[in-house]
Amino acid sequence: AAPFTEETQMTQTNPILPEVRAGTVSREALVQAALKEITQNYREASLSNVAREYGVSLAYVSECVRAQTGRTYKELLQKHRMETAARMLRRSDMNIQQIISLVGYENTSYFYRLFHERYGQGRASA
């Protein structure tokens, strides 16, 4: 196999990677990658994954997200998780513990507090 097989494969799966290596990846591309991480991997989403993938610092990606969206990555992730949980509560017969786990929370009381802050109500009226 060619010595650059791994790099070639990474470039094919992530077309922005060569731009990152050349120092030309846009802030918008980083923010889009962060938002994609939230929507596609919200259960275990991490901004560190995006920073590592694009070869930039966590602080830089975080700053890009906040500058472009007006919210922190954590706020955006929580919003997506809460909206997903609310949808699941309305449309499924899963119990609340299953939903809490599926949306990425391990601490039930923390989930309830966030849910109540966001919606001002419990499961029955969600």
Where are the regions that the model predicts?
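Inter-domain helical "communication" segments and dimerization helices
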Residues: 1-45, 49-60, 67, 71-73, ...
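Intrinsic disorder/low-complexity signal
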Residues: 5-6, 62, 82, 105
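Alpha-helical DNA-contacting segments of helix-turn-helix folds
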Residues: 45, 64-88, 110, 114-126
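Terminal helix-turn-helix DNA-binding modules in bacterial transcription factors
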Residues: 32-40, 67-106
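Append "Primarily bacterial transcriptional regulators
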Residues: 48-57, 61, 65, 99-106, ...
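Low-complexity, intrinsically disordered/propeptide-like segments
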Residues: 7, 50, 92, 114-117
